[in-house]
Regions:
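Second-shell residues forming the walls of enzyme active-site clefts
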Residues: 1-80
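Mid-to-C-terminal alpha-helical segments outside catalytic/metal-binding sites
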Residues: 77-104
Length: 105
């Protein structure tokens, strides 16, 4: 994808689904990644999830609130994005159940 880094590319992430992968797509660190400095932290999370990612990894606690706010804002404004988040949450919960981490009690 010449227009997007792989982490933000629906084309690249979509290849996983085309090849039959139906599991959770997890980012590398999006919070402190030097290679992504030019992208505002909130947009890093939004763009990864919009491209088809499921779970954002962030090693910089200073940008967590901004990432969460950015994702919430986009979800409120964009039904398709909100539906992607719902599907992502379902995949994450299914994985947790599969490995015995779903029940916290």
């Amino acid at each position: 994808d010449p227009k997007n880094r792989a982490v933000f590319s629906a084309k690249v992430i979509g290849l996983l689904r085309q090849w039959g992968y139906d599991g959770v797509v997890i980012s590398d660190d999006l919070g402190a990644a030097v290679a992504l400095k030019s992208v505002p932290a909130a947009q890093r999370a939004v763009r990864f999830l919009a491209a088809g990612g499921d779970l954002v990894i962030n090693a910089n606690p200073g940008v967590t609130a901004g990432m969460v706010a950015g994702v919430k804002k986009r979800a409120r404004a964009d039904d398709a994005f909100d539906q992607k988040l719902t599907a992502s949450a379902a995949r994450v919960l299914a994985l947790k159940e599969k490995v015995g981490l779903y029940d916290c009690g």
